[in-house]
Every structure is written in C-alpha cells, then in structure tokens.
Amino acid sequence: MTNYFRSNVEAMASYVPGEQPPRGTQVIKLNSNENPYPPSPAALAALQDIDGEWLRRYPEPLGGEFREAASKVLGVPSDWLIVGNGSDEILSIVIRACTEPGRKVVYPMPTYVLYRTLTQMQAADILEIPYQENNVLPVAELIAADGAVTFIASPNSPSGHIVPNDDLRKLASELSGVLVIDEAYVDFAEESALDLVQEYENVILIRTLSKGYSLAGLRLGFGVGNPKLLDGLFKVKDSYNIDAIACKVAAVAITDQAYKNSCVAKVKASRTQLTKDLKQLGFHVWDSHGNFLLTKPPEGNAEYLYEKLKEQKILIRYFQQPGLEDKLRITVGTDEQNHILVRALRDLLR
C-alpha cells in the first residue's frame, strides 16, 4: 500500500478520548470530566440571539469579544490572551510554534496523554519523568531536562493533585524554554498560578470553558501569557480558529461568574460525598482538586468493574497505562448519578 504519511505519524498511536455515546442514549456518563450541570442561562440566551448575519461573515480572527470579557474577569490585559478551539488547540499551537525534530518536550507522568500525541506529530523528542511518591513533582529532574517545552497540568489528570506554586515558580525561573501550566481543572481547585504569567515571560497558562462553565461541546479555550511569547504563537494559529458562535457564547458565560461558582460549589460538595462513599466501599481515593476522582478498587479489579458498569450503561474511565492498570477515574456527577454509581459498585463488590 502507498505510504501517504510521515514516518513519525505512521509510528504514533492516536489519542483515545473517553467514549461519547450517541445523543439521546440513556447512560450515566462519568468518563470525560464533563460538568453535570447545564451552561449559564445567560450563555444559552446569547446562543438564541445569534442571527444569520453572524454566520454570513468570517469571525473576528483573534476572538476579540471573548478576550475583552476574559480580561475583565481575570484582571489581565486583553493582549495577554490567545483564544483557541478548545484548550487542546492552544496546546497544539505551542507545540507547533516551539518544537521540531531535535527539540525536546518534557513532562511528568502520569498526566494528560495528549501531550505525547501532539509532540509525536511534530517528531520532537519526548522525555517523560515519573512523579515521585505521593505525587511530588520531580522539580530537579525537570529543570535538568530543560525542554523546549515543559508541560505541567495543575490540577493534574488523572491524579487530581495540584502542583504547589513554589514548584512552578522554581521551574519558571530555571527553565530556558516555555513552561506550559495547564489549568483545565482550576475552577475546582483552591489556587491558581495566574500570577506567574506576569512574573515570567516564558510561562503560558492554559484554561478551558469545558469544565467549570459546562461548554465542552462549544470548544473554546485560551492561553494567558506575555505578549512577547504570544506573538510567536499567533504566527502559527489558524486564521479563523474561533467561530463567531463560540466567541459570543463564551464571552457571556465567563462573565456570569455567579452561576459558574454555584455549579462549581455543587460539584465540590458532591466530590466530598462521593469520596466518602467510595472509601466506605473499600476504595482508595486520592485527594482531588478537579471534578473527578482517581480511585483504586479494593480487590484490584479495575478493568472488571469498568466493563461491568459499562454493561449497566454507567461509563467511567479505565486507562491501560503503566501505573494505572489497577485504577479507575470517575467524573463527579450529580448526587443522583453518584448514588446510582455507588449502588452499582456495592452490588458488584458483594
């Protein structure tokens, strides 16, 4: 067969997202870390207000309306923001702008596996450094590696732990390359590294509206960084990467902080209760600062439980990766969804 693809693409494995059942399928979906509550009513109203004139014209290329709204919420100038088709696109833009064969991308493991996929697309070198015991960041090893790009997810997935800002500040001050702090789950955490962006030119902070704002289907994320760093990223950004609908709705959603905070508070309360319930079943549950829990079943039968729950139309996440084979990641759902999950697990463990 004709070989159409670059050798690095032939060799790489595709990123595998959580299963997305067809719309209308009756399932308890706790596998993709989606927010169980609907988007802001104000955002939904903005969606209804969009008319054909918005769709006839090309969108504003830099997502200006969203940048202005996010600027006011975050307290940073709008020219410190780059907007993307989900935060994954911002990650991709960084990789495209900063790496090539012979340049190294570094990150601790386990973490978001898309970092590996994006790096392989560019045929850049990869160095994966294991987390130390109790999810302690291997700061010295990351500094010694000095990648062209270093990814740190905080809160991390699938573990849910947060990386101390002191560790991130140490990395930012010592690394010569770009430090990407992926804060996709920060809305459910107690602290952020946002201040580091204004202290260090080599830091870009990545956020999304998929989690805290319930807009995973809309696809909008953004990066916060020094304009000197963003200038290089804009060079490789697609010309019209943010559609007009996403920009408009996301601008309204990020402005409605009261609604977002109310949903986040409910998720955090449910996270606490679900942690307690799973521990009563004998699970080990790691402390989480995200909208999910990393758990270890009492009998080490993670894959079995994953498959049996799937038969009952309850979807959670099982990773066939080193160090995760005996663990399950569970998205925090509504209290009702969590009760159904716990009841099913209790029956399976009898």
Swiss-Prot record:
InterPro entries: Aminotrans_II_pyridoxalP_BS (IPR001917), Aminotransferase_I/II_large (IPR004839), HisP_aminotrans (IPR005861), HistidinolP_aminotransfase (IPR050106), PyrdxlP-dep_Trfase (IPR015424), PyrdxlP-dep_Trfase_major (IPR015421), PyrdxlP-dep_Trfase_small (IPR015422). Keywords: Amino-acid biosynthesis, Aminotransferase, Histidine biosynthesis, Pyridoxal phosphate, Transferase. The modification N6-(pyridoxal phosphate)lysine is found at K211. Its cofactor is pyridoxal 5'-phosphate. It is an enzyme of class 2 (transferase). Pathway: Amino-acid biosynthesis; L-histidine biosynthesis; L-histidine from 5-phospho-alpha-D-ribose 1-diphosphate: step 7/9. It comes from the Bacteria. GO terms for molecular function: histidinol-phosphate transaminase activity; pyridoxal phosphate binding. It catalyses: L-histidinol phosphate + 2-oxoglutarate = 3-(imidazol-4-yl)-2-oxopropyl phosphate + L-glutamate. GO terms for biological process: L-histidine biosynthetic process. Its EC number is 2.6.1.9. Belongs to the class-II pyridoxal-phosphate-dependent aminotransferase family. Histidinol-phosphate aminotransferase subfamily. HAMAP family: HisC_aminotrans_2. Homodimer. This is Histidinol-phosphate aminotransferase 1. It comes from Trichormus variabilis (strain ATCC 29413 / PCC 7937). The gene is hisC1.
